[in-house]
Amino acid sequence: MPNPKRYATILSVTFGLFAIELAFSLVPTATLNFPSEGAAPGEFPQQWIHGSKSALDNTDPAVQVHRFNDHTYILRENKAINYEGAFMYVFFGNGVALLIDQGSTSSPALFPLRQVVDELIDAWETEFGQTSTHLIVANSHLHGDHYAAWNQFVDRPNTTMVGLTHEEVTNYWGFTNYP
């Protein structure tokens, strides 16, 4: 039987790749080459951190950052902060970054997702000679463990919030037949 967590990760990455390809098609100029022959290869970590049994004793970062490839990052919420251990994805392209999901914890003090994403954007821009990367914040689906830190991005400059309702999502992506 396939591993459901691995399947969910692969499904989320596939959705993200589709969404970012759609988002990048809206960008008129490109300086990086992103061939569209399929998903770019990358590597998963040997093991995800799990946090400590007690959040008081935890020494692991609140957000584990894994570089899947040059333009794709997989983030994981520390399970000592929230038992869900939510996964989030950041995809980079010409002038645009796409954040899929925002985890299970809203508090920036406990779960500084925006700070981590801002640092990733800054580092990626420096490495690839990009500036003013626009961030799109979207969700794979609307369970609370996927959008709790949404509030951290609402006032972020140069950011588009796709929305949390079915209508907002379908209007933004242009879906006409979406479940």
Question: Residue locations for each model-derived region?
Answer:
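Hydrophobic membrane-insertion alpha-helices, especially the h-region
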Residues: 12-23
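Conserved beta-strand hairpin/beta-sheet module of binuclear metal-dependent hydrolase folds
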Residues: 63-123
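Active-site HxH/HxHxD metal-binding segment of metal-dependent hydrolases
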Residues: 108-179
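N-terminal Sec-pathway targeting helices
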Residues: 2-14
